[in-house]
Amino acid sequence: MTYAIVETGGKQLWVEPGRFYEVDRLAEVEENSPFDLSRVLLINHEGQITLGHPYVSEAVVRARVLQHRRGDKIIVYKMRPKKKTRKKRGHRQPLTRLLIESIELNGVPLATAPSRTEAAPESNPEAAPSAAATGIPADEE
């Protein structure tokens, strides 16, 4: 299993190819465009760990921006007892959803996301015989 720990938005994320993650809004990137995360703190490739000091040089995590969205609403309610003072406010954090495509070290991809055509199983129409092929009428089944 290959994974990397990257830093984005002041937070650290454990990322794996083929998975998507929600990070704080990346305003400078448009939807469905590639984005490189260059602040890689650690890479684990088949048990071999590469640790940065603080970042791994020549390491890049390639991602694609799937969408910009807003998170769930969080209600903030402030109340001072016995004073009839109440404030109810809501907050929705702006987020960006990233799909991790590959983890690269020194320009060599260590792991890539499986393509969608490989992951989708093919339908086999011959797997289940129809009623006409078996000779049993549909009423008796």
From Swiss-Prot:
Pfam families: Ribosomal_L21p. One of its GO terms (cellular component) is cytoplasm. One of its GO terms (molecular function) is structural constituent of ribosome. Residues 118-133 have a biased composition (Low complexity). GO terms for biological process: translation. Keywords: Ribonucleoprotein, Ribosomal protein, RNA-binding, rRNA-binding. Belongs to the bacterial ribosomal protein bL21 family. This protein binds to 23S rRNA in the presence of protein L20. Part of the 50S ribosomal subunit. Contacts protein L20. PANTHER family: 50S RIBOSOMAL PROTEIN L21, LARGE RIBOSOMAL SUBUNIT PROTEIN BL21M. This is Large ribosomal subunit protein bL21. The gene is rplU.
